């Protein structure tokens, strides 16, 4: 299946700059969606669409930082490149603390923006890949029975069947059967692989109480 084409979301309330930057980015080979009003972008934003956001810092109704804050409240991790008419250090620091991937002045050369966009798109690609892997692991965990999840939690800590049996108050041979099913459903053959899945899955991976 062909991956969807990333979109460069360009938000700037100055029409002339919006048009000029949009034309330059299209000439560089990007697919661009232009928004003169940040509220319009927020209303139409679809987190399923890959890409990045090139965002004017100083807008009248909603500032770039306001947009960044609202996206964060939505749980979005869309990469943001801020660009501003002036190099304001406090604003730049606040933007970067909020997770922006870059901060450029509007006087910066076009090549700098293109490079920043490529960096942001690579960041977005990797983040989406990690989410897909995490969702796949969670789907595997969801296929386990409650007892298998308990065994999984113990196996992931490196415990032997005998130790797991004692902890769960069951026979060692029963644990062996459950362990085999767990490994098969999780698609792994070793504890090391299981621990790698746990690291990718994060806090939703079953743990021993």
Regions found by a protein language model. Give the residues of each.
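Active-site beta3 strand of CheY-like receiver
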Residues: 48-55
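Basic, Lys/Arg-enriched C-terminal extension of HTH/homeodomain DNA-binding domains
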Residues: 183-209
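Recognition helix of helix-turn-helix DNA-binding domains
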Residues: 160-193
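Acidic catalytic/metal-coordinating carboxylates
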Residues: 36-37, 61-66
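C-terminal output helix
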Residues: 88-90, 107-118, 167
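Conserved acidic segment of CheY-like receiver
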Residues: 2-17, 21-25, 38, 53, ...
């Amino acid at each position: 299946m062909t991956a969807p084409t990333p979109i460069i979301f360009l938000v700037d309330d100055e029409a002339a700059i919006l048009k000029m930057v949009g034309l330059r980015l299209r000439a560089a080979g990007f697919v661009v969606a232009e928004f003169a009003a940040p509220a319009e972008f927020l209303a139409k934003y679809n987190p399923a669409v890959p890409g990045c956001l090139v965002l004017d810092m100083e807008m009248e109704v909603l500032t770039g930082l306001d947009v960044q804050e609202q996206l964060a409240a939505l749980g979005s991790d869309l990469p943001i490149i801020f660009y501003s008419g002036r190099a304001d250090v406090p604003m730049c620091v606040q933007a970067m603390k909020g997770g922006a991937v870059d901060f450029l002045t509007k006087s910066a050369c076009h090549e700098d923006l293109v490079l920043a966009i490529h960096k942001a798109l690579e960041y977005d690609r990797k983040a989406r890949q990690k989410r897909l892997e995490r969702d796949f692991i969670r789907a595997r965990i969801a296929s386990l029975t409650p007892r298998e999840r308990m065994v999984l939690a113990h196996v992931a800590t490196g415990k032997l069947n005998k130790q797991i049996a004692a902890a769960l108050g069951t026979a060692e041979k029963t644990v062996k059967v459950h362990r085999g099913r767990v490994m098969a459903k999780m698609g792994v053959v070793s504890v090391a692989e299981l621990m790698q899945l746990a690291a990718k899955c994060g806090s939703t991976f079953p743990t021993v109480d």
